[in-house]
């Protein structure tokens, strides 16, 4: 299955929008909203977010191969700006996203499920788990299938990814 940059960017935008709505309404996610949040994959492989995308004239500086991502990138920045309390918070969100472009690659659920199954088959059922780079929590979810009462501590340094994790 090929990595569809445009679809991944769309999925991320919808997940961010959903997280901001949940924050604003101070409530837990519905089943449908959880599904949207779980499609969030971070911005690894989406270097387009490093390009300027404030106004239409910025598009002339984009590579031709990335132009189809210009409008969604503008939408992403607008969404973050509209949901930031001030320019400082907006800049922190964007800086966090940009810092993750080279590092935010998420492990597919099929792999985390297999790892959890192998550990369980070997009678490894942790009472405590530390997830230092949690993303949207796929390792935690997989491990909790076999150790539902485990005490979990999950961290995520990317600010927007951390919001996804908090709502999952």
Located regions from the model:
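Class I S-adenosyl-L-methionine-dependent methyltransferase catalytic core
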Residues: 1-168
């Amino acid at each position: 299955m090929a990595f569809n940059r445009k679809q991944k960017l769309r999925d991320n935008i919808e997940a961010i929008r959903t997280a901001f709505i949940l924050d604003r309404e101070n409530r837990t996610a519905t089943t449908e909203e959880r599904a949207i949040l779980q499609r969030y994959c971070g911005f690894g492989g989406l270097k387009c977010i490093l390009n300027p995308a404030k106004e239409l004239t910025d598009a002339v500086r984009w590579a031709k191969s990335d132009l189809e991502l210009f409008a969604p990138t503008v939408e992403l920045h607008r969404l973050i700006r509209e949901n930031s309390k001030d320019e400082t918070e907006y800049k922190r969100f964007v800086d966090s996203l940009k810092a993750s472009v080279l590092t935010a690659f998420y492990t597919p659920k099929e792999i985390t499920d297999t790892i959890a199954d192998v550990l369980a088959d070997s009678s490894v059922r942790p009472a405590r788990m530390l997830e230092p780079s949690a993303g949207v929590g796929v390792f935690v979810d997989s491990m909790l299938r076999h150790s539902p009462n485990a005490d979990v501590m999950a961290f995520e340094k990317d600010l927007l990814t951390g919001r996804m994790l908090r709502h999952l």
